[in-house]
């Protein structure tokens, strides 16, 4: 797998299946990386077939202590961009969760990281996991973690920045939560971004329903940024319950 060093959102990524395809794919990825990020740096890594994209939420403090807040499964993607996220992962076992959590905490403490962060892994069908990257910020999908462990990540990040210490306790899901990204796109035109004015906006609600957004009726979606305009999150006692709520809200 070829990847851009400054990449994100699937830009500058190419899978190479044959050695004679490497040079062409490298040049193509490099050009895309330069156009997208102004940086032509590239690297290669092992290609994992049929991977699961599973990330571990971590928090570290100024004393060098870190904890994890379990995983998020971000495997449902389009063009290497996340569409839905959930926790706990239906692919996970308790053993794998503990192993990945321990690895994430060890890495976080080794670099003396402070604040909330996410360590992302690819997991193969045999449940071997491979480090991809660390996102040193709050993730778009952080609400599902907050919902299942009753933990305010934003508040915790502010406390850590103020010098407070974390408890050091690792957290595990008590509920099931799913997030769907709401994008301003045209499904009849290859899902291209569709900027413009929102004439009417109706917000869903109810028990176990959360909507994070900045838009409103009359808001004009600009053409310059990512097409995501909202995040719809449902939480229930079971995965089936969270899915049922989500389907009822988006009218599928």
Where do the language-model regions lie?
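Functionally critical, cavity-lining and gating residues within the transmembrane helices
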Residues: 6
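Non-catalytic, regulatory and substrate/membrane-recognition segments associated with hydrolase enzymes
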Residues: 3
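ATP-dependent carboxylate activation and anion-phosphoryl transfer catalytic cores
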Residues: 9, 16-250
């Amino acid at each position: 797998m070829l990847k851009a060093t400054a990449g994100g959102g699937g830009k500058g990524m190419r899978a190479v299946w044959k050695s004679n395809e490497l040079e062409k794919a490298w040049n193509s990825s490099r050009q895309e990386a330069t156009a997208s990020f102004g940086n032509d740096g590239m690297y290669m890594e092992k290609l994992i077939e049929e991977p699961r994209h599973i990330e571990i939420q971590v928090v570290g403090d100024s004393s060098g202590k870190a904890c994890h807040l379990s995983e998020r499964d971000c495997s449902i993607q389009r063009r290497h961009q996340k569409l839905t996220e959930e926790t706990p992962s239906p692919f996970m076992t308790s053993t794998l969760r503990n192993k990945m959590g321990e690895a994430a905490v060890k890495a976080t403490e080794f670099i003396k990281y402070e604040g909330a962060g996410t360590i992302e892994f690819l997991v193969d069908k045999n449940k071997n996991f491979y480090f991809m990257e660390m996102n040193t910020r709050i993730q778009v999908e952080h609400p599902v973690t907050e919902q299942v462990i009753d933990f305010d990540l934003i508040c915790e990040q502010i406390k850590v920045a103020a010098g407070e210490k974390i408890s050091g306790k690792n957290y595990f899901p008590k509920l099931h939560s799913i997030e769907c990204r709401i994008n301003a796109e045209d499904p009849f035109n290859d899902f291209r971004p569709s900027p413009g004015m929102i004439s009417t906006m109706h917000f869903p609600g109810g028990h176990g329903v959360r909507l994070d957004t900045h838009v409103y009726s009359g808001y004009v979606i600009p053409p310059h940024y990512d097409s995501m305009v909202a995040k719809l999150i449902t939480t229930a006692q079971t995965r089936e319950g969270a899915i049922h709520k989500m389907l009822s809200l988006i009218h599928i």
